[in-house]
Amino acid sequence: MKIGILLSGGVDSAVALYQLKNEGYEIVAYHMKTMKDEFFLNRQVKHKICCSPSDTVDAKLIAKTAGVPLKVVNLHEIFKEKIITYYLQEYTRGRTPNPCYFCNRFIKFGYLMDLMIEDGVDVISSGHYARVVDGKLLKALDKEKDQSYFLASIEKERLKKIVFPNGDKTKDEIRDIAKKAGIHVHSKAESQDLCFIPDGDQKRFFEEQGIKIKSGPIFDKYGKKIGEHTGLINYTIGQRKIGVSAGERVYVTRICADRNALIVGNEKDVQSDKFSVIDFNLLVDIDKNFEATVKVRKNSTEVPCKVSLENHRVIVKTTMPVFAVAPGQAAVFYRGDIVIGAGIIEKIL
């Protein structure tokens, strides 16, 4: 069997490659480049990011040391079309985008996966922390590193051709394997920031794309102006540090793109127990009305809920109020370790 592995240049995918090769599979590594190298020249990278020129250097050395062929794939145009354009549009609409969720669907396990299959690859692998069992997506055993939230966008029929070798291991175990195997990136830092905003300067990035960021009013829930924001792209639902003094702790409760305004309120005002979800990706066979738990952010606590499909939208009713349900973010549904499905939060009901 021929396995194509997404080799990022980091320790996780390097160890995944190492494990699969030791199991005797024929391996071909693929390293994707989402931005041109010159894009990074005049940017000071604050934290480790993926898909940088240094990652390409590391990926080449990992593949060479392992004795497997490596294909470097330039995905600049499709990445701009599917991810960057979407990211810009969502923020200008006052929503909070989730580019990693869509990158997994459209780029890594979409466009690139199709290219790999055209090359004759039978199975696709990566260093993600998750599991695929009998065609179902499951959480990783290491719940702190679990990445099933971002992988829940993958189309159901593609899961049967995907394997995640790291899903049953902890990060410490992965680093230990890498160190013992002499893999040079065994202590490499994890990626933290967006690959297309390596310096973390959102304002600069938007203005480079021709979108001017404007300041605007901040209103309390009664309509009284209490301050000025620095541009809607700098805020998300539930954010507390907004630079105003309101006499009490306040949070962003609404982002009004049509008025270029923020609405703030107290903690109770930013809690919701009913919301709608669009672009639902169902990963298991289940009735259109079902019970599950839901996560509305990568690091949020799962909350029990009832889910129903109504007029091509999923309506979610949680058993308790959920903090900071942000339109544009992914809502991912679970039963135990199994991912039931996922979609994009449309609005609070």
Curated annotation (Swiss-Prot):
Localization: Cytoplasm
Any one GO cellular component localisation term in the record: cytoplasm
GO molecular-function term, one example from the UniProt record: ATP binding
Catalytic activity, as annotated: S-sulfanyl-L-cysteinyl-[protein] + uridine(34) in tRNA + AH2 + ATP = 2-thiouridine(34) in tRNA + L-cysteinyl-[protein] + A + AMP + diphosphate + H(+)
Active site: 103 (nucleophile), 195 (cysteine persulfide intermediate)
Function comment: Catalyzes the 2-thiolation of uridine at the wobble position (U34) of tRNA, leading to the formation of s(2)U34.
Recorded family membership: Belongs to the MnmA/TRMU family.
HAMAP family the record matches: tRNA_thiouridyl_MnmA (MF_00144)
Protein name, as recorded: tRNA-specific 2-thiouridylase MnmA
Gene designation: mnmA
